[in-house]
Structures are given as structure tokens and as C-alpha cells.
């Protein structure tokens, strides 16, 4: 009985929950139909002088979603209302506050790479949340922001929002993943104020759509949108990779993902246009750097990776073949992409100096390349090879595993059951390393099966073989949307697990999942 009581008390200390939003008068483009006042995310009293006296969490609440004590604590809140009542608008206010806190904390932080965050103007509201048994408040009044953490009952301690308090605030903070697949959501042009105040707009959305900051800022929105639009083809390709990995991993653990469907056959085919297509997109998405400079660095990294994997790669493909060139290009491109995304790699490559040398002219840049880039490339590759369990380097290790397997088939099929028996993956990362790299186009055939009869791989396989078979693309739009959303969440959660504390980042121990327009 004592151990159970200790578990309950420990759960209270580790618990995280959003308490609510206190709104003041705001521009209509921000508040929309929302009125001023208190919007609790549960049965919580209204704040008085910036403080809420919270009742202790009951055993019923603490145990509601806990199957095992070793699993995370879960708290669920729902926002219910008619169309146009302000449900999404309320979440928008929360996202704006979280974005602005990130902006204030990170703007002055001494990091080689600055996330492309922009301030969301027009907010006059407070966000209350509880973390590790303490009440916290983020106060946002236009450009003025304050942060308070409960020191003891009834007493709130102000913590200045500055880069100096980055670790103190974020080490007990939460990471928010907002999911909304509505075609009309998060269109930045809908966030432009009609009043003369042109500072209120939707430009802030661009900085939080895609995680290219190594999970530095504690907020991301999915799926990725460019100028309010979702690239369906790109989303399909990314979702295909995630769902393939999750479904096979589920099968290996005698579970199904998605529920009631089991992967049967994985097909693959190399994309001989991969290098041309990827290089074009990479240069376009990194337009702040000169294209020729990027190509030169990729070339040097190709040469360096060739010394590591060239002999093995020659056993698979002819040196002059497209296939050989695609594999080396992918490893070099992925390495450079890591260097332009993560601060510690950015520093090793010394991208700023690289830009200076390039701007000085061809002679200066060529001399710098010849003298220093080979040694720098060696350091970068060594760092990559010393980080086999990091989500940052996962795709490079996937490519290394592919080379070491010695499989030179350009297309083919593999039964998922055989894949599982051969590699016996225990984790998502383990499994991904054995799947085909992104320069292959893959597809997976699912079978619909009777879940009650599926207890283990061997006993279920005959059942699966006799079931209806179809590709992921043939699932209903509703099923695909649910799968895409969940695969996004699981992907980010997996990555967050591998984030270690360093000079630039803190690991997040609490996660806030927001499913807007969930009925879609």
C-alpha cells in the first residue's frame, strides 16, 4: 500500500497539464470570435492576481490513463464547441504565446544557427500550465513578456525571459506538436490584420512548421505548409516511409499499426533521377547560400565518404554508374544538410568562414578548399560515425547498412515476415537502418486481418495471406489522415527521445500533443 501511495505522489510531481488561457482585449484578427476572460482546459478556477490555487490531482485522474507505472503520465483535455465558436482560435493564441517565448529565449542565445522564428504580434493573454508539481505562467502583452514559476503555495517567482535563463525555463518546459490537416488551417495570409497595424500577420507560422532547428524551439506544427499549402506528393512520400517503419516494427512486436492491418510485402526500386531532383530542391531550400558553394562542399564530402565506403560500393556498382554516384551523393548531401541544421556540426564546418572565403573570390575559395576542407570533412564524418544512435545520423547509417549488406538489386520485393525474421528489429531506429535508403522508391502491401486471431507472427501469417491485400495508397482518405497524423507524432516523439543536453539544446521531458480538427 505504501509503494502505491509513493507512486501516486511521484506521479503528481512529474505531472504536466495545460491549465488554461486568460485573454485580454486583442485585435480581431487574433481573437476572432473569442471574448475576453478565462478559458480553462478543465475544471480549474479563475486566476487571482496571477495565481491559481490548484486542487491536488485525484487518484482517479492519475490512474485513468496509466496501464503501467513505468509509462508516462497522460492528461487529456478536449475543447468542444459549435463551428465558429473559437476552438481553433484559442489554440492559435496558445501557439502564438509559445512561439513568442521561443523567439525571446533563442533570439539572444549564442548559437551559430538562428532558427527562422518571427514574433507573433497582437497577443494579450496569459498561458497557465502545471509542470512537475509547480504552477507556471507565461504573460504576453504585445512585445512585453514575463514568465513566472511557483516558488511555494501562493508565491510566484518571476524568471526573466532571456538567453541567460534558457536552460532554467526550458528544462522544465514542454514540447508542443500541433496537428491540423484541414486544408484551410494555418494559411498565413488569413492572419493579416485589417487595421493599419501591419505588424499583425502570419509570417510567424513559417518558423514553426518544420523542425530544422534540432528541436531547439519547443514547438512545431504539422503537416508542413508553404504559403498555406500542403505538398501532397511530398507528404505522401514522407508518410510512406514512416508508416512502413512503424507497421513492420508493430508486426515484429506482435501488434498492428494501423490497427487491423498488417504489412505483407515491401517492394523497392531505385530512383535514378534522385540526385538531380534532390540537389535542385536542396539548393532552392538553402537559397541563403551560394549554389556553387554548396555543390563544392558536397563534392568534397563525396570524395571523403568514397575513402570510407568506396571499396564496398565498388562491389555493388560500377564506379561510373548512376547508382554508384547516387549513393555517394546521398551520403554527402545528407552530411551537409546536417551541418546546415545542427549547431555543433555547423561549427565544425565553420559555414560562416566558408561563406567569407567564397565571397572573396574563386582563388581564395579554391585555396581554402584544398587546404582545409578535407580535414574538416574528416572531422565531420568521424563525428557522424561516433553517433550511431542519434536521430540526426539515422539516415546515414541506413545508407551504410545498405552498402554493407551487399544488395545490388535495383528493384525487387521482400516479404515482411522474412524481413522481421532476418533482422529482428527491437526499436524504430534499428528497423529503419535495415530498410532501403531514400534514393529507393518503396511501397508496402497491407493485409486486413481478424485482430482476435493475430497473437504472434507465425500463427497469424496464414490468416494474413488469405486476407484482402492492398497498398497504403488504396486506404480510405480518413484512414490515411489518421495514419499520417499518428506517424508524424510518433516520429517526433522518437526524435525527442534522442535529444541530449548540449551547449545549445535541452531535452524535453513533457510533451503537449494538440489534435485540431480531429473529427476530420
Give the role of each language-model region.
Residues 97, 108-109, 192, 237-245, ...:
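Generic alpha-helical propensity signal that fires on short helical segments
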Residues 14, 18-100, 456-520:
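Switch/communication elements of ASCE P-loop NTPase nucleotide-binding domains
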Residues 101, 105, 118-129, 135-137, ...:
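Generic detector of bulky aromatic hydrophobic side chains
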Residues 29-40, 45-69, 75, 80, ...:
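Conserved small-residue
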Residues 51-53, 106, 186, 231-235, ...:
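Generic alpha-helix signal with a bias toward terminal, lower-confidence helices
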Residues 106-117, 192-204, 498-507:
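Short, glycine/acidic-rich hinge or "gate" loops at secondary-structure transitions
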Residues 1-20, 118-121, 126-133, 137-467:
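Coupling/switch/interface segments within P-loop NTPase motor domains and analogous charged loops
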Residues 9, 29, 67, 115, ...:
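Short, flexible coil/linker segments at or flanking structured domains
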Amino acid at each position: 500500500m505504501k509503494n502505491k501511495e509513493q507512486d501516486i505522489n511521484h506521479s503528481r510531481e512529474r505531472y504536466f497539464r495545460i491549465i488554461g488561457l486568460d485573454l485580454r482585449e486583442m485585435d480581431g484578427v487574433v481573437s476572432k470570435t473569442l471574448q475576453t476572460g478565462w478559458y480553462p482546459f478543465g475544471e480549474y478556477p479563475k486566476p487571482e492576481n496571477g495565481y491559481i490555487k490548484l486542487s491536488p490531482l485525484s487518484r482517479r485522474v492519475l490512474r485513468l490513463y496509466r496501464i503501467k507505472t513505468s509509462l508516462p503520465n497522460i492528461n487529456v483535455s478536449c475543447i468542444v464547441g459549435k463551428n465558429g465558436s473559437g476552438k481553433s482560435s484559442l489554440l492559435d493564441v496558445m501557439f502564438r504565446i509559445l512561439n513568442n517565448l521561443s523567439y525571446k529565449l533563442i533570439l539572444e542565445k549564442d548559437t551559430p544557427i538562428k532558427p527562422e522564428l518571427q514574433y507573433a504580434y497582437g497577443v494579450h493573454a496569459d498561458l497557465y500550465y502545471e509542470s512537475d508539481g509547480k504552477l507556471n505562467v507565461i504573460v504576453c502583452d504585445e512585445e512585453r513578456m514575463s514568465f513566472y514559476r511557483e516558488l511555494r503555495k501562493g508565491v510566484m517567482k518571476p524568471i526573466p525571459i532571456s538567453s541567460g535563463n534558457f536552460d532554467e525555463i526550458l528544462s522544465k518546459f514542454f514540447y508542443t506538436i500541433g496537428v491540423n490537416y484541414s486544408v484551410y488551417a494555418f494559411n498565413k495570409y488569413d492572419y493579416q490584420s485589417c487595421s493599419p497595424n501591419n505588424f499583425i500577420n502570419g509570417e510567424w507560422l513559417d518558423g514553426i512548421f518544420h523542425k530544422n532547428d534540432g528541436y531547439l524551439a519547443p514547438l512545431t506544427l504539422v503537416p508542413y505548409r508553404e504559403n498555406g499549402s500542403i505538398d501532397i506528393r511530398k507528404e505522401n512520400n514522407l508518410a510512406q516511409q514512416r508508416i512502413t517503419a512503424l507497421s513492420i516494427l508493430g508486426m515484429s512486436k506482435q501488434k498492428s499499426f494501423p490497427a487491423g492491418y498488417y504489412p505483407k510485402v515491401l517492394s523497392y526500386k531505385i530512383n535514378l533521377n534522385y540526385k538531380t531532383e534532390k540537389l535542385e530542391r536542396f539548393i532552392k531550400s538553402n537559397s541563403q547560400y551560394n549554389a556553387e558553394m554548396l555543390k563544392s562542399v558536397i563534392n568534397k564530402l563525396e570524395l571523403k565518404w568514397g575513402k570510407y565506403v568506396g571499396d564496398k560500393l565498388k562491389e555493388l556498382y560500377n564506379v561510373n554508374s548512376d547508382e554508384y554516384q547516387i549513393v555517394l551523393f546521398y551520403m554527402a548531401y545528407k552530411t551537409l544538410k546536417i551541418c546546415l541544421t545542427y549547431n555543433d556540426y555547423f561549427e565544425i564546418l565553420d559555414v560562416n568562414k566558408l561563406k567569407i572565403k567564397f565571397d572573396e573570390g574563386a582563388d581564395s575559395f579554391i585555396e581554402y578548399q584544398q587546404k582545409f576542407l578535407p580535414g574538416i570533412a574528416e572531422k565531420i564524418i568521424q563525428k557522424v560515425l561516433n553517433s550511431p544512435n542519434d536521430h540526426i545520423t539515422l539516415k546515414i547509417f541506413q545508407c551504410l547498412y545498405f552498402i554493407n549488406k551487399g544488395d545490388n538489386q535495383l528493384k525487387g520485393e521482400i516479404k515482411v515476415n522474412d524481413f522481421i525474421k532476418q533482422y529482428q528489429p527491437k526499436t524504430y531506429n534499428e528497423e529503419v537502418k535495415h530498410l532501403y535508403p531514400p534514393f529507393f522508391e518503396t511501397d508496402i502491401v497491407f493485409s486486413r486481418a481478424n485482430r482476435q486471431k493475430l497473437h504472434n507472427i507465425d500463427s497469424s501469417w496464414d490468416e494474413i495471406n488469405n486476407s484482402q491485400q492492398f497498398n497504403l495508397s488504396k486506404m480510405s482518405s480518413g484512414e490515411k489522415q489518421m495514419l499520417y497524423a499518428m506517424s508524424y507524432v510518433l516520429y517526433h516523439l522518437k526524435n525527442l527521445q534522442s535529444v541530449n543536453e548540449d551547449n545549445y539544446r535541452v531535452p524535453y521531458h513533457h510533451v503537449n500533443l494538440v489534435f485540431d480538427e480531429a473529427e476530420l
